[in-house]
């Protein structure tokens, strides 16, 4: 169990414990609300206190980040291990293979999922907290927090300079101009619960792109989402007239070329929210995407 501590500064004299927890330790309102009723979860100088207690310079406020009730249906000792790129006390960076869903389907709990793999790895009673999601067909890097606190901190950092993500994609045709920003709102397509499209009444959606390599049939791109809409990168490339290779929903499916949309979460930069360490990871482009460029 992760325990956070903070020594009260002179300028924090006279504040309430909840002010220290919300301000200096950056607990979300929801997390603080759940913790304040748990026995010995919040301590002042080693003693359990109410969150309205007044602090003084030199006092030590600590909080134990106990977890919510785990899902028993996710735990299985024989689940395949996830591909772990990095792990510390607070989080993991995973390299998700294409074809593995983030969570099990309600009607097929036995199907492989990243949540089940991670729960099996961490052990019974663990609760995986994915900071972002990748479509089943998308491969690459993502972060899983080990506590709701770290999850909240990283979710707040999404699409800011504190947490940046870049993708590699192979699009059909030769994309021009060689770089730019796609600024086109995205919303749900009429008559579909899955498909998205560019539409005037959609949500603000921005994607930065850069051409890295071209062949006669395909273009390798660097994509950086500035927002996080469902299927954003796939929709924006289709909007440009260059859908991703293998994208059955927004382009043309050809399993002889590639059996999934050619999209890979390639690079991550973020600040570890507890230690303050700057983190940077890359995951090589998978072979099924590399073959398209040969």
Put a short name on every predicted segment.
Residues 50-54, 222, 260:
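Short, surface-exposed secondary-structure edge patches
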Residues 245-279:
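RNA substrate-recognition surfaces in RNA-acting enzymes
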